[in-house]
Amino acid sequence: MAVPGAVTSLELDGVAAGHGVLLPGDNLQRMAELPAASFQLAYLDPPFNTGERQTGGHARAVRVGDGDAAGRPGFQGRAYTLTAGPQSSYGDRFDDYRAFLLPRLEAAWRLLHPTGTLYLHLDYREAHYAKVWMDELVGRDRFLNEIIWAYDFGGRTRRRWPPKHQTILVYVKDLRAYYFDSDEVDREPYMAPGLVGPEKAARGKLPTDVWWHTIVATSGRERTGYPTQKPVGILRRIVTASSRPGDWVLDPFAGSGTTGAAAAELGRRFALIDENPEAVAVMRRRLGEALQPEA
């Protein structure tokens, strides 16, 4: 019997490229409603198990009068103040993180197409454990990459090396058949362009497994106000490399909807899942007409 409100394969077929569905609710239940092998790409950005409640917001920069001591210096020496907007939050503490994450990895893997790729985004707290769990779940021979997203922004401790990176583990359904489009991926400048010749230097190089990309600025235009928002540039690269226009992209921890924003921009179809009403509200505002009416 079909689950009420389920997205069936027929409904998936009826979604146009550049559009998608938003599925509020528990991602384990919602993924069980979706047809197997339907998604070319699955991107999972679960809570990192930091032990804290994650809170985010959006700050708007407002210019103040010249010489105002209350302002902070900004572009061209002008003074600005930051006005805080509404805040969103979610819990990020688990007594048994493996029991939480493993069933969701298994559910996402079931939905992956035979040529598909799964990206699992974590940080130093759980990434190494998750690698072992994924190897046990799908096999070490399906591991493709460990991507390091490096950035240089935010607070710094003086008692250890400041953590300024996150880890993205990449697994494929079949190492002989997975889809990867290196030609369409954004390219990076060579570190020593004089060694490669002018034509290659002008074209740039395929990114390695270390990605330098700034975080989403508190007062930036991209900022939605939802905590731990990922930059659209990171998702744009993932979606471009591991899916084609018209393919389905899954994000079961959708949060601020960055995966949907990148997928819509690139002409992919997407399914976003989140049980946090604040995340659902943010995604409805952010994605607007790119969302199909909910079932």
Q: Across the structure, where does each feature detected by a protein language model lie?
A:
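Core catalytic lobe of class I
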Residues: 1-293
